[in-house]
Design a protein with these regions (language model features):
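Short boundary/loop segments of OB/S1/cold-shock single-stranded nucleic-acid-binding domains
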Residues: 1-11
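OB-fold (S1/OB) nucleic-acid-binding surfaces
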Residues: 22-48
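OB-fold single-stranded nucleic acid-binding module
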Residues: 23-31, 53-99
């Protein structure tokens, strides 16, 4: 999935991108841990929020796959998130085989 394919109120599956910016994780009043940033790919940029176990897991410049998440409109912008039960992992692009 690419950023230009995102639609509000839809699931996000296997979105691959690079973390352009990433704020420090913080705790919101409900006690949940959240970390915000900007994810980019060759088609654009989107705000991203990592929640709970996914917050604090990555650093700026990491390539990630948002394997299970959601997309919504937040402050008039598209935003993707792991939500409470989503999953994001670090992505290592396949390297060409040496001959």
């Amino acid at each position: 999935m690419k950023i230009n394919e995102l639609e509000p109120n839809k699931k996000v599956v296997n979105l691959v991108g690079e973390l352009l910016t990433l704020e420090e994780p913080n705790e919101i009043p409900s006690g949940a841990k959240v970390q915000d940033g900007v994810l980019q790919d060759s088609t654009g940029q989107v705000r991203i929020s990592f929640w709970e176990d996914n917050a604090g897991k990555f650093k700026q410049g990491d390539k990630i796959i948002l394997q299970a998440g959601w997309c919504k409109m937040f402050e008039n912008e598209l935003q993707v998130s792991t939500g409470k039960f989503g999953k994001a992992i670090k992505y290592t692009p396949p390297q060409p085989e040496e001959t």
